[in-house]
Amino acid sequence: MNEKQMAKILIKELSELGFTIHKYNAVTTSSIYLKLDYGICCGIRISNHSGKKKYHYRFNIVKGYNGDKVTYSKNLISYFYTFEQISQLIRDVQHERNKKIQRYGLNNYKKYMEIEKESNPLFRRFKQVI
């Protein structure tokens, strides 16, 4: 399975769970980036190599990954999965969204999504797929 096939599966599964999904294909690598609920929930990096140090994605699914499952950098946490761990990734993403809805309340969560939709220039580059 390659990155495009993995992205297709994730988009299908996450859209069935009610996520709003934006996708960006990297220009210089085969990496694909998904933003969920306008970035309010989290981002997912789908790749076959280590990520750049200056970027941070909460969830990373990396083909053939062999390293720490959890990393911490500058008070940020990142989770790493192999392509075979897609079910666990989806469960963890759902849990992340549920934690944020509990913290902010559903109405505020939706309000924050709307604010990001209107004001974040990132979503001019990311294509909405769902």
Label every model-predicted segment:
Residues 40-96:
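Intrinsically disordered, low-complexity regulatory segments enriched in Ser/Thr/Pro
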Residues 1-39, 69-77, 83, 95-130:
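Negatively charged, low-complexity tracts enriched in Asp/Glu with abundant Ser/Thr
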